[in-house]
Amino acid sequence: MMKFGLLTAILDGWTYEEAVDIAAEMGFRCLEVACWPAGKAERRYAGVSHIDCARVLEDDDYARHVVDYAAGKGLTISSLAFYPNTMDPDLEKRTAAIDHLKTLIRASEKLGVGMVTTFIGRDQHKTREENYQLFDEIWPPIIHLAEECGVKVAIENCPMLFGADQWPGGQNLMCTPDIFRELFRRLPSPSFGLNFDPSHYVWQQMDYVKTVYEFKDKLFHVHFKDIKLYPEKLAECGVLAYPLDYMAPVIPGHGDVNWPA
């Protein structure tokens, strides 16, 4: 049965315990817990860390507290969340992202969570085909580790293309059904799937319902979000404009995703 939860990245500045408390008070049943490494955030909702995954691996008492505190409030942890660019053209940033993602996978096993939610990443200045080659180099060891740990890795389908900073290709390759098929073909694994967010289909003008049926066995986790497309703005700037020029993220029910479908 699907549980309705909360991504704790919106609670920047709150402790893990405070995030659990507020989620429980609001009636949520699970948490996707933000687990970025310590440091300055490079974008909104990034850089938040409610669980120290390196400490989880080293400190059994801390790991037990993380699980027990949530359980004591009637919550489970649906996933450990970290959304970096593992294919960043900056090799130092790329290596750091990959290393920390592997730490999350190991911590997810130890905590009994069994899920990590993240991005594939993308070198925004390279073609799709060149990024496929990067994927072949970077991702098999990550997924093989997940298999060994009994952890599922769920990739969110956000293109990470909003404005000039991500232009022209965006910073997350895995964002359309044809790319899903190609990457699942290149790396077939029961540990490799989707954290599906239909809102990103709205401004790309794709059929999210069809994707649910086609990739039903790969839907490990779902984001409940919405986007409003503004046709009058799109008619002025066209699809090659920055996406935020013709769409906006909104509260679910106020956008174009037909959630009851």
Please tell me what each predicted stretch does.
Residues M1-C30, C35-G39, D61-R64, A71, ...:
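Histidine-acidic metal/acid-base catalytic patches
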Residues M1-L7, E42, I77-D88, R122, ...:
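N-terminal small/glycine-rich loop or linker at the start of catalytic domains
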Residues K3-L6, H50-D52, D88-D90, K126-R128, ...:
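A short, structure-level motif marking secondary-structure boundaries and short turns
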Residues I10-L11, P37, D52-A54, Y83-D88, ...:
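Short histidine/acidic/glycine/proline-rich micro-motifs that form metal-
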Residues E18, R64-S79, N85-G193, W203, ...:
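Active-site acidic/histidine proton-transfer and metal-coordination neighborhood
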Residues E32, S49, A96-A97, Q133-F135, ...:
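Alpha-helix boundary/capping detector
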Residues E32-V66, K126:
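Glycine-rich, proline-tolerant flexible connector loops at the mouths of alpha/beta enzymes
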Residues V48-V56, R94, G169-G170, A248-I251:
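Short glycine-enriched, charge-decorated loop/helix-capping segments at active-site entrances
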